[in-house]
């Protein structure tokens, strides 16, 4: 991982090179897995057509780049749900995503595909042979007794037997909430009692509201993200940017965003920087390995007898980006084989 000083030096170097390097004009999609600006627009048009949660944006006019149309400076999808933190996936296999990418280890810049969590030996130990299970012919004892309905006599014991007869049917009284204040019909309460009860109930509701989030850990805290895709002139690939909100629509802090990044990529391939078209801080996935990964996927398509299409580039791209942000559920649903 680069230090802050190294990152600053690298950014300055990239900006300098971008200014003097001509924009890619010849397609190298099949040879190198990169895009020209025109191919980026073509791929973005298909993405916005097939997945209408994505839109083209113009951004700040003062930050527009000349090699892209003014109304198509970058792609954006808003309010993308993120229901879980990455740490909650500890027992869920992500092999279906990890298998999509096999990149050779080229040192610090190599792309890391997360491995399924858990010990395979433990999984094997939990398997049970159904043939070894024994079935007991004995009927289990039950606490419910069935009795004949009482005749015309009014013996008090029969009342108890009636209760046993309906033992399996829950009584409404069983659902009595211990926190309910009103034990009597409010319509018959005196004026003083009604005032006291109302005040107490209001205080109780206020306390419940204050403690609701703290006391109930089962509440689903849904974060949302705005995700944008820009064209990176230096790397000649798309670059993904993330801006997150908590359940109260407050912007997430950088350390909170990293909770939604794959452990193998947080602080390594994901860093914080100013968005090139908006001028505010976003987290972004570093594009240094994007071309190599895309070249792998394009080659795999060719090996499987499929003709790679440059306009489908972003669907392949977003598919492998999901390895980095596995719990952020953005749309990239287009059926094709890789």
Swiss-Prot record:
Its main location: cytoplasm. The keyword Ubl conjugation applies. Residues 141-157, 192-210 have a biased composition (Low complexity). It is found in: Cytoplasm. Pfam families: Autophagy_act_C. Residues 158-186 have a biased composition (Acidic residues). The active site is at 288 (glycyl thioester intermediate). Residues 91-100 have a biased composition (Basic and acidic residues). Residues 91-215 are annotated as: Disordered. One of its GO terms (cellular component) is cytosol. One of its GO terms (biological process) is protein transport. Belongs to the ATG3 family. E2 conjugating enzyme required for the cytoplasm to vacuole transport (Cvt), and autophagy. Responsible for the E2-like covalent binding of phosphatidylethanolamine to the C-terminal Gly of atg8. The atg12-atg5 conjugate plays a role of an E3 and promotes the transfer of atg8 from atg3 to phosphatidylethanolamine (PE). This step is required for the membrane association of atg8. The formation of the atg8-phosphatidylethanolamine conjugates is essential for autophagy and for the cytoplasm to vacuole transport (Cvt). This is Autophagy-related protein 3.
